Amino acid sequence: MENMNLGADVKPVNYTINVRGQLLDLSHPLVMGIMNVTPDSFFAGSRVQTEEAIRQRAHEIVAEGAKIIDVGACSTRPDSDPVGAEEEMNRLAFALPIIREAEPEAIISIDTFHASIARRTVEEFGADIINDVEEGKDPEMFPTVAELGTPYILMSTAANLHDMLINFSREVQELRALGQKDIILDPGFGFGKGAVDGNYTLLSVMERLQVMELPLLVGISRKRMIHQLLGITTDESLNGTTVLNTIALMKGANILRVHDVRPAVEAVKIVEAMRQNAEQ
């Protein structure tokens, strides 16, 4: 029988980031749990708006093994209604004290593309990470995160790996020149890659992003590239999500951003066990 090369396991970049003066080791993959304080994010299971629901979701994310809670107050799904920065900030101002009280040790990431919101959530509410899904489109974002000194997640909207590497190289250089130390790269699955094909092409070569020598975050949870390919609904997309998260881990992901924390934590444990017990 002919040998089939399914691709070697690629270990994540050995990297630490500074969170609240503590070094967070990303050489062993971590899980980031999604909390959307919105009425219209694409997966209903992540939406919470009342005080009790926010508290319960925070407890659930941490209890299932996530180190990071990613809080979004503006839906980025393609057909969502636009939300102004003021309303986005009002939602976050309500939710963040509840989350911090419920889980004081959790690392809180803010999913926003507004520099003004990045500043306020860090300075007024003690947010730990800024997660920017618009690749620094706000001209004040890079200077703001560099001044704040918080880790920054830079998500690509490029359609292919070639353009992504060119853009990332330029953007990282700009951030470094401003003094930004901790940068995490997100290939941006579901953003500008097409519904299915472009996303799978990118996933197949994702390990090549390690040339940037920066940690990689993958947010692939329950996205259209799963349910459109399989002919199922978003609610039925957990199995596909777990498969893709496992592939992402084997291609060097440092952080998995997910709606369903426990399956992702289990995927991390299984891949890590395989690495630890691999034949030398």
Short names for language-model regions:
Residues N3-D9, V19-R20, L26, F42-E60, ...:
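Active-site-adjacent loop and "lid" segments of alpha/beta metabolic enzymes
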